[in-house]
Amino acid sequence: MLESLQKYFSVFVKCKGKIMSVKSVFYQTTLALVLASISYSAAAETIYAAASMTDAINELKAKYEKKHNAKVKTSYAASSTLARQIEQGASADVFISADLAWMDYLENKGKVSATHRKNLLGNRLVLITPVKNPIKTSIKFDKNFNIDAAFTGKLCTGNTNSVPVGKYAKQALNNLNWWSSISKRLVETEDVRAALNFVSRGECQLGIVYATDAAASKNVKVVGTFPLATHNPIVYPIGMINTDANSKRFYEYLQSNEAKAVYKKHGFSVLQ
C-alpha cells in the first residue's frame, strides 16, 4: 500500500515556504499517527479506591491490564482523603468510596454526576483481636454488656469523624451504649488497613474493621460481627470522574461479572 501511494502521488506541495514532496509529507503524517496511537494505548487509567478495596482492586488491575493491554494506576487510602484529593484536582478516572457520604461530597462539588455513580458493594463490621494475644472474654453485642471490663488494652479503628469504618464504628458503639465507657481507650487511624495493622502487631487488643479486612490477615481473628441494626448499611459506591472512552470502559469493567466474582472472592457482597 505504501509503494502504491508513493507512485500515485508524484506532485509536490508547499509547506511553510519550502518545497516538500508528498512522499515526505506521507512519511511524516504516518509517523505522527503511529506516535499518537502509541501514546493513546499507553495512557493509564487511574483508580482511587478505599483502603479496604486494596486486594480486590489489585487482582482486577492485573486482569484488566492483561485483557485490554492497558495500564492501571492505583491509589488507596481512606475515602475521606481520596475524596478531598479529587476535589483539589487529583487525576482520578474512577473512585470507589467505602461510604455514600464521600461520594455525595464529590457529587455536590461537581466532580461526579448522579448518572455516573452506582452502589456497587456491601460489607460487614466486625470486632477483631490479635491471634497471638487474644482477649479471653466472650463479647455479647447488647447494651447490658460491660465492654470496658472485657479487655485491658486499646481499641483501634479509623478516625471516627471522617474515615468511613470509624464512622460506622462510632455509630455501633453509641447504639450499644459502649461509646462513653471506652472512647478514652480508642486509637483512631488514618484508614482501616492501619487499624488492622495495629491489631495484627498486638498494639491494640481490639479493633473494629470490615469483615473483608479481617479475612485478609492471618494475624487477627474475628471476635464477633456487629448487628446490622447498630450502624448504617455499609455501601461502596463507584463513580466515574473522567468520562472519556477509556475511563468508561474501565468503569464498566469494574461492574462486570468477572469483577463481581473477584469481589465475592474477597468477601464483599455485590449490590447490583
Located regions from the model:
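Bacterial N-terminal signal peptides that target proteins for export
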Residues: 5-8, 15-30
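Short, linear, compositionally biased motifs with a strong N-terminal bias
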Residues: 14-15, 36
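Exported/periplasmic ABC-transporter solute-binding proteins
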Residues: 35, 45-67, 73-80, 84-90, ...
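N-terminal signal peptide c-region/cleavage motif recognized by signal peptidases
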Residues: 38-42
